[in-house]
């Protein structure tokens, strides 16, 4: 669907997900992440970039596992994560939009839990490339976890946490030969409606991840 069509449907409150493609498993157990290897940090930083042309090939499960762990997985026995959050609130959740459905990443169990058995990729971004890329990450703040943070500061703190997560994804993509782009121009109301979010949850950002499109 074109960008203009999405914007028009969004203005009318009619931007809706498509039916799921394939079987929607209620949960997906991810393989243990490979936390060793990769390219040196300085090299990953030199290769970090935003790309907007994606192959349609789905990411193998081990790659998805490593990606989500790098983004915001648990890296310490005490439950610490790979990205910081103010007062360790860990208020940002990662929703994974796949052709078969939208899933919530559970870092404690390192698995995905089905949220809605629909293809949300049309909804998760205005850009036309989002529809066909195999994976979109949606970052959502859950402010019920922010009781120690002043109300007027919660949104800013959540965006800082989400920004750190997106940079982790960028660096993993650079290290793994993937393409990614972070997007703030999204229909937050349509995404929240499609995922059935509660009033205390706020859609922050969306990030497409895929193999880069090969041009001939």
Where are these regions (language model features)?
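Short, surface-exposed helix-loop/turn micro-motifs enriched in polar/charged residues
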Residues: 86, 180-183, 199
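Small-aliphatic-rich amphipathic alpha-helix that forms the alpha element of a beta-alpha
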Residues: 48, 67, 94, 135-191
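A short, structure-level motif marking secondary-structure boundaries and short turns
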Residues: 25-27, 153-155, 204-205, 210-212
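C-terminal helix-cap and adjacent tail motif
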Residues: 4, 32-34, 202-216
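N-terminal amphipathic, basic helical "cap/leader" segment at the start of enzyme domains
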Residues: 1-133
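Short, electropositive alpha-helical surface patch
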Residues: 191-206
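Solvent-exposed coil/turn segments that connect beta secondary-structure elements
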Residues: 99-100, 142, 212
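Beta-rich nucleic-acid/ligand-interaction surfaces
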Residues: 82, 87-88, 186-193
